[in-house]
């Protein structure tokens, strides 16, 4: 069996590692020209399936936590906290034996997953061909590849999905009624320490009355442990966000920052500080429009979808990456079975196996898409059940800025 993977993001690379461990032939193609071509995102929570994920990969991989933990080099456990507006109690999760998890910095995570993977860069999919005998993918640079299975791991605006379904992105992607302002900043000294006291990692400020859900998070810590990059996303439900005349599409960075500070004006100074310290140039100029994807079915054949190409969702429940990793591990098992049973050229066996994968993947993915969409409404977020585990009260404690050896 020879597997073609379009997309060297978290999902495509995880699948490649799973295939590498099983000795299954593969090629992986990425549209970016190199690994630093574009921003990879901030941080992602790895939880509940971390042990399974590590076990699914070859033994020559570096330690996942050491390679990706966004708290490194600080010797404190990461936390995910929530602060309801009507309460002074902090609830959430802390990395511990009862609720183990990693907040992985996404650039480090992608590099980790790329260990010993020969990524072919600058390969933007132009078109695909598939029939009962095999698959072929052709790229904008004039090259192409042929194989037995093509996996579309090429993200939200998947060309593989578009070609497989013969539907445009606008036909299948739903605009999320979510207006958001995003800011970034660097903190050091006492300001850094005060943020760590609010959470060793990330925290959400829930304002049920105003309908705002604001997520603040550490991105990564400097090598000396004395400063860190932070980011925040202030969002609320807004069905008019796609209107080109929406005020956010025309607002200056200063106007967006002023709005965020006004929304936070009734909160305690410790919660206002991260917004007060955000420089104007740290506010994102563009207004991001989130989209999600619910597919009721997919064709079963030699072209398979996974990750955001199959079930993109909002980031607020932390389930996008979780589902992508499950997709990769599940698909690897299906392909391994076909390979071992020598069914690579048996189209009926391939259809049955891909049907099995699609059914489970879509049911799980659609459920997460729907639950993630509900979190958009800040007035309802208090009633939502998280994936990781029941939230617990997290008491406050002093934060020693001790750096690991």
UniProtKB/Swiss-Prot annotation:
Task: Tell me its cofactors.
Answer: FAD
Any GO MF annotation of the entry: monooxygenase activity
Q: Which EC class, in a word?
A: oxidoreductase
Task: List the SUPFAM superfamilies hit by this protein, alphabetically.
Answer: FAD/NAD(P)-binding domain (SSF51905)
List the EC numbers from the record.
Answer: 1.-.-.-
Q: Which residues bind FAD?
A: 30, 45, 106, 308, 321
> Which residue ranges does UniProt annotate as crossing the membrane?
none
Keywords, alphabetical: FAD, Flavoprotein, Monooxygenase, Oxidoreductase
As for what it does, the entry says:
FAD-dependent monooxygenase; part of the gene cluster that produces the tetronate natural products trihazones. Transcription analysis of thnD confirmed this gene is expressed, hence its role in the biosynthetic pathway remains cryptic. The pathway begins with the formation of trihazone A by the hybrid PKS-NRPS synthetase thnA and the trans-enoyl reductase thnE. Trihazone A is further decarboxylated by the 2-oxoglutarate-dependent dioxygenase thnC to produce trihazone D. The function of the FAD-dependent monooxygenase thnD has still to be identified.
By sequence similarity, the record places it as follows: Belongs to the paxM FAD-dependent monooxygenase family.
Query: What PANTHER family does the database record attribute to this sequence?
Result: FAD-BINDING DOMAIN-CONTAINING PROTEIN, MONOOXYGENASE, FAD-BINDING
Q: Kindly provide the name given to this protein in its UniProt entry.
A: FAD-dependent monooxygenase thnD
- Organism of this sequence: Trichoderma harzianum (Hypocrea lixii)
